[in-house]
Amino acid sequence: MTAYKDRSKEELLQEKSQLEAQYKEFQGKGLKLDMSRGKPSAAQLDLSMGMMDVLDSFTDLKCEAGIDCRNYGVMDGIPEAKRLLGELIEVPADNIIIYGNSSLNVMFDVVSHAFTHGIMGMTPWHKLDKVKFLCPVPGYDRHFAITEYFGVEMINVPMTPQGPDMDLVEKLVSEDEAIKGIWCVPKYSNPQGYTYSDETVRRFAALKPAAKDFRIFWDNAYNVHHLYDEPQDVILELLSECEKAGNPDM
């Protein structure tokens, strides 16, 4: 197939006419396609229909801590929910916060708070001359949209089948105090479906960033959403690895 740049004007006009005809044909079909990403199908939604039958007007709606769950609840979530999520992601319930209805919502709020109030008493990012983030590419565009929204300088880091290029990550974060974070989808990273290796996770946990308020944004969105029934990828739990490496808050 001849590249467009090598075609004559007549050939390009002919191609344009053919594509317009195809476009009109598609329009004529009256298709109404929902191309939303990550939106469950009706069959997937049906899996949770049993939840609709669990409660009725006679149900005791107080949790084990005595909190009336019909009300606003508590800031970090009820104990039962924290324990359930802790078991799913292999993290102690004390380290779980039940918050928001999506990880993207939570990450946006964390970045926003870092800009307005800083992280753990450190300088708010809006007072800094420059804020930078490492962005493994290809990666998730909605992550990048957050940093773009806040005017953060984004630095590309190439992806490998084992995860981001850790030689480059280690070099960049150790040399530049303006680098405040990195976006990560550690399991089945879009679009290649790569899962971070054990070595990659341990190297993340052992990072020595120049910025004391550097944070790893570990968006393990596909923790229980495997691509196939078999095999299923397993990754090391980052928080415990960070604690082992002496970086419990990173």
Question: What does each model-found stretch correspond to?
Answer:
Residues 2-77, 86-87:
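N-terminal "arm"/small-domain region of PLP-dependent enzymes with the aminotransferase-like
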Residues 67-212, 223-246:
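Conserved core of the PLP fold type I
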Residues 219:
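Glycine-centered flexible beta-alpha turn that most often forms the glycine-rich phosphate-binding loop
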